[in-house]
Amino acid sequence: MHLKRFTDLGLRILMHLANEADPETPHSVPELSRFLCWNQNLVIKTANAMVKAGWLSAVRGRHGGLRLACKPEDLQIGDVVRTLEDNDMLVDCNEPPCPFAGRCVLIDALARAREAFYKELNQYTLADLRRSGPGNGVSNLMCSRAVSYTHL
């Protein structure tokens, strides 16, 4: 299963915020965009979805930004991926119309595989993903791509 860029970014935002020493300190969208090497507009779109889901809170104002709205140990990764992926089907049987529709065994097999994928990911919480942060040096990595931030 290939995750959408939207989901990938959402997981990275959550991991970054979970690795912060002070969970109460809000992080601005430009800061997250620079650190994670993602377009600021996509960071905003992804963050809005995660605020709506209740995983992040947005603090307005000059010193505002985003911070976790839940405990990392309460946030299961499979639930995050399922919500951000926002699709029920791995294949679209309607476009173009499939001649096997209504009698296809593959669609059921794919649905079971998708559920097994989410179930496996739910064995991990955001707290578990903090292991890939401080101590392993991941939190100290910056974008290695040549990116211009003059538009931020």
Question: What are the residue ranges of the model-derived segments?
Answer:
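Short alpha-helical segments that sit at the start of domains
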Residues: M1-I13
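Short amphipathic alpha-helical elements of helix-turn-helix/winged-helix folds
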Residues: R12-E20, T83
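A short alpha-helical element within helix-turn-helix/winged-helix DNA-binding domains
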Residues: P26-L36
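Basic amphipathic alpha-helical segments that dock to polyanions
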Residues: A47-V51
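Beta-hairpin "wing" of winged helix-turn-helix
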Residues: W55-H63, R67
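Non-DNA-binding regulatory cores of transcription-related proteins
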Residues: A69-S148
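Conserved small/polar residues in nucleotide/adenosyl-binding loops
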Residues: T150-L152
